[in-house]
């Protein structure tokens, strides 16, 4: 009988350990998913900001060259 009790206890401990490992794995995956999402949002924001800066710089350059062209009578 004692052997049966020890076997049951062993199975219970193994089951509890497996549940703990599964829960830890799920928590780790959630952290990875959140970090991935945060990284993607940061990259999206960086791309947006970079494009806005490029557009602004291009517009400023265009305005500058247009002003120079008008000043020297090259543009109307």
Curated annotation (Swiss-Prot):
Keyword Transcription regulation set for record: yes
GO cellular component terms, A-Z: cytosol; extracellular exosome; nucleoplasm; nucleus
Cellular localisation: Nucleus
S-S pairs: none
Domain of life of the source: Eukaryota
Function as written in the Swiss-Prot or TrEMBL entry: Plays a role in fat cell development; promotes adipogenic differentiation and stimulates transcription initiation of master adipogenesis factors like PPARG and CEBPA at early stages of preadipocyte differentiation. Its overexpression confers resistance to the anticancer chemotherapeutic drug cisplatin.
Name recorded for this polypeptide: Adipogenesis regulatory factor
Record organism: Homo sapiens (Human)
